[in-house]
């Protein structure tokens, strides 16, 4: 969660649908980067710091609405470290083929953290929403490569040799 607009809008949509169709409401979980977690810490962060640049927000615009959504849904908000975010980032890219920016992976990191601590509800469907494509933050992807990007001569042999070196 950065400015908390998404979780607020999602909750509003769920409530409106529930009121029209009498559906069950979900329990909402929100995760902020540890270095930019004003809602978790209940204080404005003057100089937020995190690798997850899209959620590097020290004073969210929808702060109170997000707290209301979490309270009304009996949900929770927690923080995740940059290391947990990067672990989730690599897991999603490597195992699932999902290339999303680090900020989006805060939700995955949070679910992993809840699962490891035994706090994830058992027998429930869990949905994590990843809104940001990995191309929004290519520097993180490049920094994690084992085989660094380099200019190649424009010939088939060089390209094949480079690809074989990456596999």
Label each PLM-derived region with a short phrase:
Residues 1-2, 29-32, 128-131:
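Short beta-strand segments
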Residues 1-3, 81, 98-104:
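Active-site nucleophile and cofactor-binding loops and adjacent substrate-binding regions
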Residues 2-11, 36-39, 104-111:
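Short glycine/serine/threonine-rich phosphate/pyrophosphate-binding segments
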Residues 4-7, 32, 60, 134-136:
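Gly/Ser/Thr-rich beta-alpha loop segments that engage phosphate groups in nucleotides
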Residues 9, 40-41, 138-141:
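Short, glycine/acidic-enriched capping/hinge loops at junctions between secondary-structure elements
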Residues 14-99, 143-167:
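Active-site/ligand-binding loops adjacent to catalytic centers
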Residues 108-167:
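Catalytic phosphate/nucleotide-handling subdomain of diverse soluble enzymes
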């Amino acid at each position: 969660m950065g400015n908390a607009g998404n979780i607020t809008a999602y909750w509003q949509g769920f409530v409106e649908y529930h009121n029209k169709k009498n559906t069950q409401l979900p329990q909402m979980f929100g995760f902020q980067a540890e270095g930019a977690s004003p809602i978790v810490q209940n204080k404005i962060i003057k100089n937020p710091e995190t690798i997850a640049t899209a959620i590097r927000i020290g004073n969210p615009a929808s702060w109170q609405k997000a707290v209301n959504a979490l309270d009304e849904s009996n949900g929770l908000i927690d923080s995740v470290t940059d290391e947990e975010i990067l672990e989730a980032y690599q897991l999603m890219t490597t195992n699932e083929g999902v290339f999303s920016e680090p900020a989006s992976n805060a939700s995955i990191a949070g679910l992993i953290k809840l699962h490891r601590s035994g706090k994830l509800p058992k027998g429930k469907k869990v949905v994590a929403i990843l809104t940001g494509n990995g191309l929004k933050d290519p520097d993180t992807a490049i920094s994690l490569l084992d085989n660094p990007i380099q200019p190649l001569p424009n010939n088939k042999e060089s390209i094949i040799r480079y690809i074989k070196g990456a596999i």
